[in-house]
């Protein structure tokens, strides 16, 4: 199981939000590229970047910071936030990003996901954010009437590389991930699932490792590695042992 460090960008700096609320942010580093390099040096094999301003605005907002991150690291990086059309996807992939994440647009325009997968095979990830099992969009500002499982099933046959599943009520709260909801989603589809939201201790990662066989292939961690609640290199060592058995 991959442990994937997150870099959330707001106004060009590295922040963390509580429950996706833009007015509840903490700045952790004003140099996102140096932060990305730090996670790479601790053993990260993949970086997760979110353009928070883009997620709320619906268009890219932190391109300079994203470009600086990609230039600084040699590991793959994936990006989400404000990606609503093929032109934006193409523009980001041309910067050197390995994968892009379609979130709000996946719910509002499933055809975009299908077209993107056809044009950029293996490089499209769907981000599904849910509150009490229901999909939330527009930077989590709006909860829809569709379940996370029903949305995931729409993309079963179009070549999505992975689904990132975030339980919003857990995100940034350091309360532990929603194991059962993550397992249910992973078992409902054949697409690999990456868990996100609420990971606060190594024990949380151990708990997620118990559902790896259900199709959970990675875990994104943000706030916990910035506050020191989890040391990234220790989490990577923990999951690495599991990978070698």
Swiss-Prot record:
Sequence similarity: Belongs to the HisA/HisF family.
Locations listed in the record: Cytoplasm
Catalysed reactions, as listed in the record: 1-(5-phospho-beta-D-ribosyl)-5-[(5-phospho-beta-D-ribosylamino)methylideneamino]imidazole-4-carboxamide = 5-[(5-phospho-1-deoxy-D-ribulos-1-ylimino)methylamino]-1-(5-phospho-beta-D-ribosyl)imidazole-4-carboxamide
Any one GO molecular function term: 1-(5-phosphoribosyl)-5-[(5-phosphoribosylamino)methylideneamino]imidazole-4-carboxamide isomerase activity
EC number(s) stated in the UniProt entry for this protein: 5.3.1.16
Keywords attached to this entry: Amino-acid biosynthesis, Cytoplasm, Histidine biosynthesis, Isomerase
Gene3D superfamilies recorded: Aldolase class I
Pfam families: His_biosynth (PF00977)
Classification via HAMAP family: HisA (MF_01014)
Transmembrane segments: none
Keyword rRNA-binding assigned: no
GO biological process, one term: L-histidine biosynthetic process
Name assigned to this protein: 1-(5-phosphoribosyl)-5-[(5-phosphoribosylamino)methylideneamino] imidazole-4-carboxamide isomerase
Annotated Gene Ontology cellular component terms: cytoplasm
InterPro entries: Aldolase_TIM, His_biosynth, HisA_bact_arch, Isoase_HisA-like, Isoase_HisA-like_bact, RibuloseP-bd_barrel
Metabolic or biological pathway, per its Swiss-Prot or TrEMBL entry: Amino-acid biosynthesis; L-histidine biosynthesis; L-histidine from 5-phospho-alpha-D-ribose 1-diphosphate: step 4/9
Disulfide pattern: none
Organism: Pelobacter propionicus (strain DSM 2379 / NBRC 103807 / OttBd1)
Enzyme class of the recorded protein, top EC level: isomerase
Coiled coil is among the record's keywords: no
Coiled coil: none
């Amino acid at each position: 199981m991959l442990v994937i460090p997150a870099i959330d960008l707001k106004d060009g700096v590295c922040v963390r939000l509580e429950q996706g609320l833009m007015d509840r942010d903490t700045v952790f580093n004003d140099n996102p590229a140096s932060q990305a390099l730090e996670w790479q040096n601790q053993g990260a094999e993949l970086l997760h970047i979110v353009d928070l301003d883009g997620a709320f605005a619906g268009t890219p907002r932190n391109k300079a910071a994203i470009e600086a991150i990609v230039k600084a690291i040699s590991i793959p990086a994936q990006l989400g936030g404000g990606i609503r059309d093929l032109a934006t996807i193409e523009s980001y992939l041309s910067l050197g990003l390995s994968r892009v994440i379609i979130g709000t647009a996946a719910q509002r325009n499933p055809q975009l996901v299908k077209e993107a997968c056809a044009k950029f095979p293996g490089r499209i990830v769907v981000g599904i954010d849910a509150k009490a099992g229901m999909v939330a969009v527009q930077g989590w500002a709006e909860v829809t009437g569709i379940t996370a499982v029903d949305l995931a099933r729409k993309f079963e046959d179009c070549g999505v590389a992975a689904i990132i599943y975030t339980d919003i009520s857990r995100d940034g709260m350091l309360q532990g991930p929603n194991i059962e909801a993550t397992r249910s989603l992973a078992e409902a589809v054949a697409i690999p699932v990456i868990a996100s939201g609420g990971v606060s201790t190594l024990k949380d990662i151990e708990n997620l490792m118990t559902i790896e066989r259900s199709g959970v292939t990675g875990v994104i961690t943000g706030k916990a590695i910035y506050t020191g609640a989890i040391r990234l290199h220790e989490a990577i060592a923990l999951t690495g042992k599991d990978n070698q058995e």
